[in-house]
Amino acid sequence: MKPLSSPLQQYWQTVVERLPEPLAEKSLSAQAKSVLTFSDFVQDSVIAHPEWLTELESQSPQADEWQHYAAWLQEALSNVSDEAGLMRELRLFRRRIMVRIAWAQTLALVTEESILQQLSHLAETLIVAARDWLYDACCREWGTPCNAQGEAQPLLILGMGKLGGGELNFSSDIDLIFAWPEHGCTQGGRRELDNAQFFTRMGQRLIKVLDQPTQDGFVYRVDMRLRPFGESGPLVLSFAALEDYYQEQGRDWERYAMVKARIMGDSEGVYANELRAMLRPFVFRRYIDFSVIQSLRNMKGMIAREVRRRGLTDNIKLGAGGIREIEFIVQVFQLIRGGREPSLQSRSLLPTLSVIAALHLLSENDAEQLRVAYLFLRRLENLLQSINDEQTQTLPSDELNRARLAWAMDFADWPQLTGALTAHMTNVRRVFNELIGDDESETQEESLSEQWRELWQDALQEDDTTPVLAHLSEDDRKQVLTLIADFRKELDKRTIGPRGRQVLDHLMPHLLSDVCAREDAAVTLSRITALLVGIVTRTTYLELLSEFPAALKHLISLCAASPMIASQLARYPLLLDELLDPNTLYQPTATDAYRDELRQYLLRVPEDDEEQQLEALRQFKQAQLLRIAAADIAGTLPVMKVSDHLTWLAEAMIDAVVQQAWVQMVARYGKPNHLNDREGRGFAVVGYGKLGGWELGYSSDLDLIFLHDCPMDAMTDGEREIDGRQFYLRLAQRIMHLFNTRTSSGILYEVDARLRPSGAAGMLVTSAEAFADYQKNEAWTWEHQALVRARVVYGDPQLTAHFDAVRREIMMLPREGKTLQTEVREMREKMRAHLGNKHRNRFDIKADEGGITDIEFITQYLVLRYAHEKPKLTRWSDNVRILELLAQNDIMEEQEAMALTRAYTTLRDELHHLALQELPGHVSEDCFTAERDLVRASWQKWLVEE
């Protein structure tokens, strides 16, 4: 065994001072001193349990001792009689065995492959033991779940990721998917439960047993987000539901994840074989599938962007040449050829890598370099995590932990270790780029003329700039030179390292050459330099623009077209990553795919890290807004589609925010008990105004109200029991908080809940019955107008149907025409007096006479006036389709409806484009005169003369 290095020998004295007397007095072996010096986790554990150290000294860890884990744990659980006892014993067993694994790993008593096997088998043993104990307990409590033939149904657990592959980290969370075979109900219990309810409740208890922190710690952090539909999907699915999902909706990234899926525990039973056979066709295609390369390339791009966003420098998992790239290399061959080559269908990386070499898919040299690099990186990762039992892949910056790792990895010092690490990661990166790297060869632009470099370096006299700036006016030339000079002065005020200066000196001549070729060079340069000032200390973003000429080109064209986009990029430079791929930049997410894209995006963030979750939501929204705006500018999205995309994006955000708030509230209080025997959450979010009418703009806020169907006597079922209606109030407050909290990425949306019954004076969340009663007996006409543009944007089917029925009933009430006309007209006149244009000789597109609001009032009036006779008028909540309905139902002549639709979309289009230019929503008084005259005539016809 290698002696401790000098820094570690000094640290040993600190360790001695921490040890209790029985250990301090004891003559510790050299092995014990080494491990206690290396790992604070082992130190803390043996201080709390000195007998573990005695056991380690007398029974040194062996490579094959994982075979005894199940028997050892069974003995530990033999006297457990309740869930609290189960939780305690599982935690103590996990910690004891992890100390043994850390001991063996630190001293290199066993191979790294054996360490990975032990870590994975320990997790599986604990998961299966907890499941089996809880299954028996739940069957005693609720009866045994059976299928139609009366056969008992088990809970099957898929271990995903490294757990499934038998390659678990030292300190890792576990990704699981729960499934049961067939529908049916319980037998032998006090009352019948269907299997879905039984397994959902059992699954919740299993997660609690493994995941909930106690004074003994936790067993594993459990992540269930890889299941179908993610957090919004059922916790446990039947085989049939799983099969339907993966056949109909399974995404490429889910196929990638499923490669490593392994059934925990008895994997040879009938049901296990059935589940495995069902999933295999989804993962391994019968044909050779080269489309997977682009999918994996896209996923790697997402990871690279995440590394930049979160500043994950020195990350041996996600960085270039890291563990993830080796995994991608191996899985590319599995996904492309696994359907034809059964030998590639292994879940574990190293055996699969050997098969890849044997099939000559990679050269023996490349495969061997990857194998050696993988074992090196995994040992480094596990040692790093075993210092504090902490889930990290980022190399330490402090001297002590660097000395620890250098010693444990058998290097003289930190520079020697990092030198070897760099060599391994360089080898991995080379193979990765050859296989999965961008398929377009990066061509170097022709070298720029020396004059552009001199212009940037301020080496040109003003007269010398004439050739490169000759096409610009004298004023623009002076402005460009001033902007360059001012930018250089700003740089002098900032701390930019040598690498940053080097990248800037390469980037700026290219940038100036492209910008100054434009007629609007001065304006564009002013926007871009404002952005660059914000990122000059973040070299990775400068490198992005320097190394990807296409990204620089898109940056220039978008900043030239829209100061709003320039401002967004300056405020949130992480959006620069979106410029890398024009296929996605100018092609917004499909309207029905926002929820799934967001779900995939959030999977990269720890579920229990609220701060990162909030940031991720905001970053996703900003990236999607950029793509929508880019497509808008490029003319590929008409105004109606812009609003559709903005609305679908908002709905995806609402879905995710409600999900996060729900998880947080249930963790604190439990669920309201009226939900125990039904699906869903008993909660709905209703969108009003632009959201309800599918008419959101770039900076629109969200008008929301919250409904629940909780009975008066309901209580929550958690340890901190509260009134059920109080639960929904706190849920709504939490939702508002998640939307409105300002992080470094800003707020998510401004949310206005004042359209709820009784406005700001009313309860934030309302029961469905109280909402219906208010609308029937207390609401004003303007509130019924608002209801025309309202719809459920999140909610259970029952609540959605209830709201739709109330809305339809209210809109179909018989109304006296003259009275309604007067009330609507007077409300509009009040609004105009309050909100109308205060700018002389300007037309406010939304608020002034002949503008958008007049059109909205016309449609609302006509729906309320005629829905009693024409119920079909209640179908839609957006103005364009309401105008279509008015024509189809012979309320309005088709010619007038089409003309109002054209006027409406024209005015909204102008508002979108003014927003992109960061201009207020008013224009010269002589603009849109034809549209305004048309709207005025229609207003006169319906709301004055009739």
From Swiss-Prot:
Residues 449-946 are annotated as: Adenylyl transferase. GO terms for cellular component: cytosol. GO terms for biological process: regulation of glutamine family amino acid metabolic process. It is an enzyme of class 2 (transferase). One of its GO terms (molecular function) is [glutamate-ammonia-ligase] adenylyltransferase activity. Keywords: ATP-binding, Magnesium, Multifunctional enzyme, Nucleotide-binding, Nucleotidyltransferase, Transferase. Its cofactor is Mg(2+). Its EC number is 2.7.7.89, 2.7.7.42. Residues 1-440 are annotated as: Adenylyl removase. It catalyses: [glutamine synthetase]-O(4)-(5'-adenylyl)-L-tyrosine + phosphate = [glutamine synthetase]-L-tyrosine + ADP; [glutamine synthetase]-L-tyrosine + ATP = [glutamine synthetase]-O(4)-(5'-adenylyl)-L-tyrosine + diphosphate. It comes from the Bacteria. It holds the Pfam family GlnD_UR_UTase. Gene3D superfamilies: 1.20.120.1510, Beta Polymerase, domain 2, Glutamine synthase adenylyltransferase GlnE, Nucleotidyltransferases domain 2. Involved in the regulation of glutamine synthetase GlnA, a key enzyme in the process to assimilate ammonia. When cellular nitrogen levels are high, the C-terminal adenylyl transferase (AT) inactivates GlnA by covalent transfer of an adenylyl group from ATP to specific tyrosine residue of GlnA, thus reducing its activity. Conversely, when nitrogen levels are low, the N-terminal adenylyl removase (AR) activates GlnA by removing the adenylyl group by phosphorolysis, increasing its activity. Belongs to the GlnE family. PANTHER family: BIFUNCTIONAL GLUTAMINE SYNTHETASE ADENYLYLTRANSFERASE_ADENYLYL-REMOVING ENZYME (PTHR30621:SF0), GLUTAMINE SYNTHETASE ADENYLYLTRANSFERASE (PTHR30621). This is Bifunctional glutamine synthetase adenylyltransferase/adenylyl-removing enzyme. It comes from Shigella boydii serotype 4 (strain Sb227). The gene is glnE.
